[in-house]
Amino acid sequence: MCSDEFYALGKAETQCLGMPGLPIAVVPHPVAKLVPDEVATIARNVVDEVIRLWQDDAEALRAEFKEKAPPTKSRLRYRSMFEGNFSAPDAPERLNGPDDLEGVNRLFYSRGWTDGLPIIPPTPERYEKMLGNRGLDPNELLARIEPRQGEATVAKVAVNGVMAGCQPDHLPVLVAAAKALGHSDLNLKALNTTTHPCTVLALISGPITENIDVNTTYNVMGQGSLANAAIGRGIRSILLNIGGGTPGILDRATMGTPAKYSFCFGENLAENPWGETLAMERGFGAEQSTITLCGVEGPHNVNDHYGKTAEEILQTISGTMCSPGLNNSYLGGEIMLVLGPEHAEIIHKDGFSKADIKNYLIENAFIPAHVLSEPQRVIMRQYVPERLLADGDGGAKIATSHDDIQLVVAGGAGRHSAVIPSFGNTRAVTEVIRS
């Protein structure tokens, strides 16, 4: 059963599960937070249909619902994610397409195989160049990518990398990213289908940041770096073409975020006063190159040009972290703090360790009582009761343990940092990049 607005998602999910004829009872949208009388009316109106779906001939129902197409309300006129999809198990290895760049892009766009921007045609020559002589098995299965359970083989990852504009030396990063995407802690099925405006952030650490020129300094989350832009876009291409995250079908983000095009940057170890990256904090060696994937929103800037002490800067950061509209406020989960080098240096000079920073934020970063609505309190009591403060204040903590806060140093000069909230019901995953 699902609401009419999300019938397309329900239909696509039945296909993902290998049951394209699974009957779906439809109720009017929206259904969230209806009063009991409204729920009763909807139930009365749908009960006959539910009985029919339970009792009618199973084969006839399968045939009926296999052919029943979802209404298309979006202006995006993509083909079905399962029609002519080059990542389907029975898809041909090669597609004979137009000879000109514009024609290829029109074809790929019409089939829903792009992010909307022009792609590099994945010709056999470009594919072979991407694979190189690394000894990789093109048929090796790296992961199954949710929600479509698409098979992310080395070959498919390489093809999507070509399309995104990646260079051959970016492929090991994409291979590691594909493995991380398949980890259950990331909860990719939710990230790739939710109405929340989240994306997959890729944080690159270790020697490879210099080897392939990953930007770790000025404009670190912005445009200008081929490695950052192309690797992040390659991950999005994998989520779309292998995972099935087609906007308006399985990807049901209400607003979305520009970070869904590409969100990839590197840790700035050279200007990290603690000499420890997030990857090292997670148990990896300084000599290892890694990629950490996180399910996040876009970054929220922290502008503090006037704080002279660690506590003054951390107070500003605390306030930025504490918005009642964040998923972290009522689902818990991780939240990332990316300290600009100047903020990091001031905090470090005041004697704060990374653990001290986390302790400060746990104690001082809380959502004030007056901005929490009663429905929000109800949800928080249900999901994160440990975050609610004593009745005297009535506010709520944004973090309760060190594991809730990820500390990163990145960016260039200037008194700015960034808070990056997460989807909440997700955990970061780190994979070693093997050249």
What are these regions (language model features)?
Residues 5-20:
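Active-site-proximal loop->helix
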Residues 27-65:
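A charged, well-structured terminal subsegment
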Residues 17-25, 211-212:
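Short acidic, glycine/tyrosine-flanked loop/strand segments centered on an H-E-D-like triad
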Residues 1-3, 9, 188:
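Thiamine diphosphate
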Residues 79-435:
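Non-transmembrane, aqueous-exposed alpha-helical and coiled segments at domain scale
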